[in-house]
């Protein structure tokens, strides 16, 4: 169970730090390239949601941090495409093989204990000919 800092302070700090103009510029540049059915690994507070373009038909976001995904669900309400947020890790995606056209992962691999497993899972659920969009530091 998260302590008070993890539940209330840390999510706000992460959201504030990750919404700074340089990061928003990169989000806009890369996330806007997504198309079709999208899987976002590490949706967090949903900062990428505003940057998806008209070619996106649905978004499934995964993140094990429930404290962050509350804000993502709020931001999803402003979109015209269906968005579902799942409280699962990118290392163990309970999703069908070959089910997404685009996978987006921004500033997330560094926080996943086994990034190799997460990338293997992403590849498993990516449709043939699909694209992966990574932004990392």
Q: What residue spans do the PLM features occupy?
A:
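A short SAM/SAH-binding and catalytic strip from SAM-dependent methyltransferases
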Residues: 101-114
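Class I SAM-dependent methyltransferase SAM/SAH-binding core
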Residues: 39-41, 45-92
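Conserved beta-strand signature within the Rossmann-like core of class I S-adenosyl-L-methionine
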Residues: 129-136
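A short acidic, Gly/Pro-enriched loop at the edge of an enzyme's catalytic core
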Residues: 91-103
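Class I SAM-dependent methyltransferase Rossmann-like catalytic core
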Residues: 1-21
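A short glycine-rich, Lys/Arg-flanked "PGG" loop and its adjoining helix->strand segment in the class I
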Residues: 116-128
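Conserved alpha-helix/loop element of class I SAM-dependent methyltransferases that forms part
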Residues: 17-37, 47-48
